[in-house]
Every structure is written in structure tokens, then in C-alpha cells.
């Protein structure tokens, strides 16, 4: 078994590696900063044909399956449970790797509308919810200047 951070990070930054992986969709880059100004220890790039979950004004997409917009909070939570069953499973704990998979993304404030009665809002082109469960993950360790492919 190779050690987790066995790729040299001297020639690539997380941003340059993210750009090189443009052909792999969906993908994401998580950069971390401590105290608003100092680069934290790890950066993550998720990519590959894992699973994408997106809720927008056209409905809810879980992978290639398209559903109607959930009618209530129960339907939304059930759809997210369904998505978790379909997503690639995170690897068991790998020493030195703080993130090894799972759903990464966001739920906008508008998702609150499934749980609370709020005034109607003008529809946006931005998804109300967008998560990606990547097939592969590059983990940059800024302290050791190593990269792990998980």
C-alpha cells in the first residue's frame, strides 16, 4: 500500500490541477483559509462521474433521473436519502486524509421554503441546492507539499 501523499505537489497548485481536470464533470474545488487570510493545510478537488444532485426551477435531478420539484420538506428529504443511496460511498478513514468522499455542495437559503412559509420570491437561475459526490478526489497537503489521489 502506497502512503496517501505519494504524489509531489511541487509543479501544480490546486487551481492549476482543477483547470487540467476540466474534462471531468461534475467537479469542484474546495480551498480552505484560516482566519480569512492564511491558507489552511488542505485543498480538495472532487471529480469524476460520481453523482450530481441539483434542485432548480426545472425540478430535481439526481444523476440522470429528473423529478418534479418536491411538494414539501418530507419529499425533499426523501429525495436526498435516495441520492445518498446512489452516491459513491466514501472510503473508510485513511490516515492523514481528512476528507475521503461524500456529498459536497450547498443548499441555498431558498431551501428553507420547504420547511417554513415565506413570501414568494422571483425565481433564480441559480440552483437552490447543488451537491456532488465525486468518484475521485485529489487532496493537496500544503504542509508536506504532497498530493493524494483518493
Where are these regions (language model features)?
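Signature of the chorismate-utilizing enzyme
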Residues: 1-150
Amino acid at each position: 500500500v502506497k502512503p496517501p501523499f505519494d504524489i509531489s505537489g511541487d509543479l501544480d497548485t490546486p487551481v492549476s490541477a482543477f483547470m487540467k481536470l476540466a474534462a471531468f464533470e461534475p467537479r469542484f474545488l474546495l480551498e480552505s483559509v484560516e482566519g480569512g487570510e492564511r491558507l489552511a493545510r488542505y485543498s480538495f478537488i472532487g471529480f469524476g462521474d460520481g453523482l450530481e444532485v441539483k434542485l432548480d426551477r426545472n425540478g430535481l435531478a439526481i444523476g440522470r433521473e429528473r423529478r418534479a420539484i418536491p411538494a414539501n420538506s418530507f419529499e425533499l428529504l426523501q429525495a436526498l436519502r435516495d441520492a445518498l443511496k446512489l452516491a459513491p460511498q466514501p472510503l473508510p478513514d485513511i490516515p492523514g486524509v481528512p476528507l475521503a468522499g461524500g456529498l459536497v455542495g450547498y443548499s441555498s437559503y431558498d431551501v428553507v421554503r420547504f420547511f417554513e412559509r415565506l413570501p414568494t420570491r422571483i425565481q433564480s437561475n441559480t440552483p437552490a441546492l447543488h451537491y456532488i459526490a465525486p468518484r475521485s478526489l485529489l487532496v493537496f497537503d500544503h504542509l508536506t507539499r504532497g498530493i493524494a489521489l483518493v
